[in-house]
Amino acid sequence: IFYFGKQSDAKIYANGNLIKNTVLNFGYNAVNLGLPPVAKPTKIDLKVIAGDFSMKNSVTLDPVKKWKIKFIQHSHTDIGYTRSQTDILAEHLRYIDYALDYCDATDNYPDNAKFRWTCEASWPVDEYLKCRPASQIERLIKRIKEGRIEITGMYFNFDEIPDEKILAASLQAVGRIKDKGIPVKLAMQDDVNGIGWCLNDYFNQLGVKYLDMGTHGHRALICFDIPTMFWWESPSGKRLLTFRAEHYMTGNTVLEMQTGDIERFKNNLLNYLISLNSKQYPFDEMAIQHSGYLTDNSPPSTIASDLIKQWNDMFVWPQLSTSTAETFFSDMERDHSNDFPVIRGAWPDWWTDGFGASARETGTTRIASSTLTANEGGLSMAASAGIKLPNEINKSIDLADNALLFYTEHTTGYSESVREPLGQPTMEQRALKESYAWEANRRTASIGEETMGLLQSKFTREEQPSLIVFNTLNWKRSGLTTVYIDHQIIPRGKTAGIFDYDGNRLAVQSVLHRSDVTQWAIWLKDVPAFGYKKYIIKPIDDNQISNKVSDNKVLENKWYKIVTNPAKGTIVSWFDKEQSLEMIDQKNEYQMGEFILEQLGNRSQMESRRLDDFKRSPLDTIWFDSMAEGEIWNSIKFYGESATSEKPKGFMIEIRLFNNEKRLDITCSIIKKSIVSPESFYIAFPFDIKNGKHFTEVPGGVIEAGKDQIKGSSNDWYTIQDFAAVRNESTQLVIGSAEMPLMQL
């Protein structure tokens, strides 16, 4: 009510009946009116009288839902975002202690206002059970059984950088927690707008029935127009009841619960429910997530309990209650399970691009994870052969997995890293984060050495130096491996002759020379499934094999003809002889392997999800370096420089055409400048496969991009696991990337 007189008592009438006595002050007055509910849109005539002032208006009163709102309090686990990684565990352990105390402090509250708490991540709970006294653990278990505290299944919040093995390792904590008699029926992922598809299958195996996804639309799109509950179907056909919730701190960002101001909370909540209803949210029940305070890694508080108690004293409905997430899910499943749609598809995450800011460590982590998988296969071979494994080997594997988990959890920067890119907290967070990648690399290498030592014990020593290659996969393998061979065995100037026991020499090619050793590439043939092959090493003269250097700019074998453009260091023609097919789109503005630097004119474009102020640039300079011919591949190498690379020779691209397989490798490296302004660079792959469709491997399976995924999930870029492909009815081109996962298709 806008009133411009002196303060005055006022009466408000509806359809002639007095419904409110109030006081009007000069200016804007907000007045809550209590009106009986209606079953259909109903016209209400309102009248206000305050002394000589009066006004009339008519409004249409619509039917309203008898809302039941459940408030789910949690602390978002963001390791290193609000303070150093070294502080976060102690904080979250303390929060569980506080949660127990707050349960005690609100035991005399009405049940719907009693303090309740959801432990968002299982990591702090797992550690809590290891370090707290038995009496405190008993308190925790008691409150869990009462439904006052809830334990969930996600170890951390993960995007798609971790592979299936890492995600499986993250769930070991659930087993330890359940061994204590603690139920884990729900997984909660917050602040990440996607999740590995394989987790759906994993959760089903663990008895986890529900998945709560607390979104965050900053620089990302959100799936679905409204909060949506659905049956998410896994690659194997299993189903998980899943809720795409609102922002994981809607209670703080929208409702301002942390202020404790009942009037502010009341107005914000009513406006939120009006908005939710206008979007055709179909149910009367809703869950709203919040933290004790408006921050990640927030301590719990009893503010919500006090607000809910005040609200319920004022209103019959909407009914508010504190709740665990599982209670909301179980109620919805009981009342509406047949109303939820079934959606089968991957859920790619928008925020994985953050790992592009730590490309070196991300690549190292991917290599470490795949190497650890191979090493575990080697340990299985050893155990199958009757070799006793070391007592500490499982602990070593757990420590390697732990490093992988801490690197791949979703936090990629300190909260002030954009404003203070070189500040002490930013640099500390960065250093600690990247240390996990190198720790994983180191621990994995040690496990590999231990594995080889065990397997070696089953083999006799040969008169001549020998090499044993193990295949830990369950199918026969041919392909490339590399090995360092000391000059004591193969002198400098000689070639490594690698012979099988039938006297057949394998194709080899030198890769790197040092004073004491040479690294050799070896092309292996038919190493048995879950088996091995043994080879003899002896020096042969260099002149027995071709290893020439030339300045030709064309590469050709029986499958492909590759024509390069020395002026740009790119490929202008990639001709498939078998199919008489040109593989490159000749009309594309970018050539195959072309370097593209993209720089933004302003950072705000990322927040507003637009791109209208940017510059794309090729390399500043590029030059031909060399061409080499070898037994395994022939290659052309170019060097270049860019504004984003160090000098000299900041960028390298090598094109390798293989002689033993229908395969082309394009290897790129950059000595990157440290730049804090928003930028990115790309390597172009403009393939021309007629009517081709894009496919990519995600954690959990292979999808057709844009089709086999939840609508609204990331499609500007994909986090490739091992490969992507373009295929039509007759042709398939497969791209593998061991280190770099981000591709735009």
What do these predicted ranges mean?
Residues 121-126, 155-160, 184-195, 217-220, ...:
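Conserved short loop/turn motifs at secondary-structure junctions
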Residues 167-205, 270-290:
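CE4/NodB-like, metal-dependent polysaccharide N-deacetylase domain
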Residues 199-202, 218, 228, 253, ...:
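C-terminal (or distal) subdomains of carbohydrate-active enzymes
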